[in-house]
Each structure stands twice: as C-alpha cells, then as structure tokens.
Amino acid sequence: MPWISSHMNSSSVLDFFPHKTMAVDIAMKFYLRSPPLRRDRVECRIARKSNEPLRPCIQTTNKTLLSELSNQENKVKKRVSFADSRGLALTMVKVYSDFDDELEIPFNISELIDNIVNLTTVEKERFFLDFVQPSADYLDFRNRLQAESVCLENCMLKDKALVGTVKVKNLAFQKSVKIRMTCDSWQTYKDYDCLYVKDTYAGSDKDTFSFDVSLPEGIQSSASIEFAVCFECEGRIFWDSNKGLNYRIVRQDHRIPSDFESRHYDPVCLSVDQYGSPRCSYGIFPELQTYSGFDKLGPYY
C-alpha cells in the first residue's frame, strides 16, 4: 500500500481513489468496519431488551378495590322476620312490685299537685247569682224604684266579691245606703255601706250608690248567702228585698237549672212600655247575670 503523507487534506484523500467517490461513502465504510467488540456489546444490549415482557397500555383495577368488591359479595343479606312467624309472642308484659321505701317527689312536682287540688277546690266553691238582674226588665225596675224609692240596679261576682250599683230616689241631701248580708238564714248578719257615685247629669231626681263586698269565708257547703238593700233618708227606712225573696248567692252544686228564668219570665208574655221598646232583655241574653267582663258599673240613665 502506498504511503500517505500526514499532511493530506480531504480533497487529496478523495483524489487518491481511482474512481469518483463521495465523502459520505467513506464515512459509511469506516462505520461498517468498526471493531468486533463494540458491535457485540450493542447486539447484546438489544437482545436483553427484547427478552423483557411487554407492559400493557391499559392499567388494571386496583387490587384493594377488587378485594372490597369480593368481600361485599361474600356478605350475607339481612332479612326481617316477625315474632309471630317464629312462634313467639308479639307483646311483653312486665309486672312491677311496690317499692319498700317511699319515693321522694321533687318540690316542684309536689307544688304542682297541690295547685291542681286547690284549683279543684276553688272550682267547687264557686258562687253564682241565684236571681235575675233587676235592670234586665227595665220597665219593672223603673216601677219598683218609683214605688219603693230604692232598687238594686245590677251586680256581679268578681274575685270572691259582690260588686254592683243601687239606684235610690233623691228625697233629701242626707241619705245612706247599705247592703245587709247573712250566710245563716238571718240568724246573724252584717251591714256594708255603699258609696255615692257622682251623676254625670246634674239635676237628676235619682242617685246612684256602688258597693264592693267580699264574700264571707268558711261558708258551709249547704248554706247560701242572702242580702238585701237598705235605704235611709230623713228618718225613714226603705228596703229592697227582691219582692220579699231576698237576693241569694249559691254554690255551683246548689245552682238552680237554667230553666229558672223561664219560670219567672215567659218570652211569649213580654210586656212593652209606652214607647214601644221591649221591657225585658233577660230572655234574650240570660247569661249576662253572671258575666264577669264588665269592669265599669254605672247607671242606665
């Protein structure tokens, strides 16, 4: 092989070949003539990679999730059954024996029980008016006042007290009106003074007096309260005793039935005064005699 100088350039190398040669052809020849050790190492690396298993592109489900699904499938489903279907009783009875020691009831519960008992007692001790309101029959009320010079106008029970008004004729300036009350059929009695009520219209020939009398305490269950109105003027005494029957206050259990009014006033026989107005309104509104909604009592004229 001829000797080649070390000072050769690329053009001189290409001129060395007998036929026309490109530089890329020379590079390929040098690459193909690489040392055998390097070529074997590259082939070994390629062979090792070809033996590894291929990984799938789709990932499988998580193992923990698969185990949970399998456990749920293995669980037994719950079922409901009734006692009678198994021959058992549908009800259960428990018997409790009395305690040897007395139970200690809290104070607030004891107080509540006492209040309930007291309310029941108060309900039994309620009183009612056992007479018709005098002013319910206005014509009769006016005639009685003209004839007897005194007449109970109206009254009602309020908080264990009897309150009302009395109408009297203005016979003189000095006059006194009182309520005489008893709870033992007049074996004993007590007088309660009435107070003068100033008339709205001056120059009237009639005066009005009011009273507020507390009912006696400790009245026997079989006893009733009776009262009458006394009017004193210029040494003369006038009485309104409900036409001799007295005004009575009775307990709830001794109250006369509601047909009491029908025996005293017949709705068919209602009288009419000279002005054409009905003389009796009690047959239309009988509940007014015990109505406790009137806070202000006053005269009708």
UniProtKB/Swiss-Prot annotation:
A motif (PP1-binding motif) lies at residues 79-82. One of its GO terms (cellular component) is protein phosphatase type 1 complex. GO terms for biological process: glycogen metabolic process; regulation of glycogen catabolic process. Keywords: Carbohydrate metabolism, Glycogen metabolism. InterPro entries: CBM21_dom, CBM21_dom_sf, Pase-1_reg-su_3B/C/D_met, PP1_3B, PP1_regulatory_subunit_3. It holds the Pfam family CBM_21. Residues 142-250 form the CBM21 domain. GO terms for molecular function: protein phosphatase regulator activity. Acts as a glycogen-targeting subunit for phosphatase PP1. Facilitates interaction of the PP1 with enzymes of the glycogen metabolism and regulates its activity. Suppresses the rate at which PP1 dephosphorylates (inactivates) glycogen phosphorylase and enhances the rate at which it activates glycogen synthase and therefore limits glycogen breakdown. The N-terminal region is required for binding to PP1, the central region is required for binding to glycogen and the C-terminal region is required for binding to glycogen phosphorylase, glycogen synthase and phosphorylase kinase. Interacts with glycogen, PPP1CC catalytic subunit of PP1 and PYGL. Associates with glycogen particles. Forms complexes with debranching enzyme, glycogen phosphorylase, glycogen synthase and phosphorylase kinase which is necessary for its regulation of PP1 activity. This is Protein phosphatase 1 regulatory subunit 3B. It comes from Xenopus tropicalis.
